[in-house]
Curated annotation (Swiss-Prot):
The gene is Gmppa. Regulatory subunit of the GMPPA-GMPPB mannose-1-phosphate guanylyltransferase complex; reduces the catalytic activity of GMPPB when part of the complex. Mediates allosteric feedback inhibition of GMPPB catalytic activity upon binding GDP-alpha-D-mannose. Together with GMPPB regulates GDP-alpha-D-mannose levels. Keywords: Cytoplasm. GDP-alpha-D-mannose binds at residues 85, 247. The keyword Cytoplasm applies. The lineage of its organism: Eukaryota, Metazoa, Chordata, Craniata, Vertebrata. Widely expressed. This is Mannose-1-phosphate guanylyltransferase regulatory subunit alpha.
Length: 420
């Protein structure tokens, strides 16, 4: 039997995802029409022998998370449970803390997936590679260009055996163009090195009597504390993929991930893609429209558009490279490009909401999304436009390269602004 663990983090993470993470936990943000981690769960559920999927994180189990878990269990006919950490424990601390739940039933191996990645999840190929070698740790790797590789965990492998000889998390100088995808397959024996790190933390004096210092020993970073330490010892191997992959750290990267997933729907879920029908809107490229959305027949949608539940799209609307969330309204003849329109927001007639894409360099096949700061030299860098929850944009204005926080009612145009 097999299990899967999805690391969803907590509210102290995902600050670059604001203001979108104000309304829902980042792992539940809709990407290509479904919550971000549903893509992970779908991939895990398709692996033969999968018996249980565990979510580990520090979020409070609110109504949204509870409803998602119930819906996932019904849809995939698998136990999907949430295990809440008592404190943020890092990428490995939760695995060690909940080791008994993970190992219950004696699984052959278990997948570990970070929630904030977009991928085609070649889990069956990883399982096949694991069964050939049966080493404790198998990492999924891909390639990046020299400059961008410094923003990731870098892997030096033996090209014949694929053993990880050296691992450095976000090195200061170039190490390798092979990077860590944040998707792993572990044997039960992989928890022993995590126990060693925990015991070493105790011996180093990080565990004290006061309750507030308890997470010190429990905090384990897989990348620095385990992978870097065990590289070159015959325990960690890498499985390379040339499939789709991207981190989802910012709202801009969510829009890029939506494009990747919508493109993949052509193979995996063609029923989710809208088709042009007589009397319906004009569809260009890959578009997702929730069944409850109301779209005027003269609207032009796509490519890379995702329209959520209860959305209203008026006559003559042009929508491209954008996500429109639950309950939003785009009135007649609005134009929305490279933007995310928040829950319940309204864009007035003849208004234009536009952002600047920060996609990877299309001329470099190994280019990845840049996770740069919002600011440079005190100025807001051009990026996608984000309208938070229940924002009202008046008629005939331009909102360009701006971020509007929730519950704002604007009265004029804005360019390169954060509207607080």
């Amino acid at each position: 039997m097999l299990k899967a663990v999805i690391l969803i983090g907590g509210p102290q993470k995902g600050t670059r995802f604001r203001p979108l993470s104000f309304e829902v936990p980042k792992p539940l943000f809709p990407v290509a029409g479904v919550p971000m981690i549903q893509h992970h769960i779908e991939a895990c559920a398709q692996v033969p022998g999968m018996q249980e999927i565990l979510l580990i994180g520090f979020y409070q189990p609110d109504e949204a998370l509870t409803q998602f878990l119930e819906a996932a269990q019904q849809e995939f006919n698998l136990p999907v449970r949430y295990l809440q950490e008592f404190a943020p424990l890092g990428t490995g601390g939760g695995l060690y803390h909940f080791r008994d739940q993970i190992l219950a039933g004696a699984p052959e191996a278990f997948f570990v997936l970070n929630a904030d990645v977009c991928s085609d999840f070649p889990l069956s190929a990883m399982l096949e590679a694991h069964r050939r070698q049966r080493h404790p740790f198998l990492l999924l790797g891909t390639t990046a260009n020299r400059t961008q590789s410094l923003n990731y965990g870098c892997i030096v492998e033996n090209p014949q055996t694929h053993e990880v000889l050296h691992y450095v998390e976000k090195p200061s100088t170039f190490i390798s163009d092979i990077i860590n995808c944040g998707i792993y397959l572990f044997s039960p024996e992989a928890l022993k090195p995590l126990r060693d790190v925990f015991q070493r933390n105790q011996q180093d004096g990080q565990l004290e009597e006061s309750p507030g210092s308890w997470p010190g020993a429990g905090t384990i970073r897989l990348e620095q504390d385990v992978f870097s330490a065990l590289a070159g010892q015959g325990q960690i191997y890498v499985h390379l993929t040339d499939g789709i992959w991207s981190q989802i750290k910012s709202a801009g990267s969510a829009l890029y991930a939506s494009r990747l997933y919508l493109g993949r729907y052509q193979i995996t879920h063609p029923e989710r893609l809208a088709r042009h029908t007589p009397g319906g809107p004009r569809i260009r490229g890959n578009v997702y429209i929730h069944p409850t959305a109301k779209v005027a027949p003269s609207a032009v949608l796509g490519p890379n558009v995702s329209i959520g539940k209860g959305v209203t799209i008026g006559e003559g609307v042009r929508l491209r490279e954008s996500i429109v969330l639950h309950g939003a309204t785009l009135q007649e003849h609005t134009c929305v490009l490279h933007s995310i329109v928040g829950w319940g927001s309204t864009v007035g007639r003849w208004a234009r909401v536009e952002g600047t894409p920060n996609d990877p360099n299309p001329n470099d096949p190994r280019a990845r999304m840049d996770s740069e700061s919002l600011f440079k030299d005190g100025k807001l860098l051009p990026a996608i436009t984000i309208l938070g929850c229940r924002v009202r944009i008046p008629a005939e204005v331009l909102i360009l390269n701006s971020i509007v926080l929730p519950h704002k009612e604007l009265s004029r145009s804005f360019t390169n602004q954060i509207i607080l």
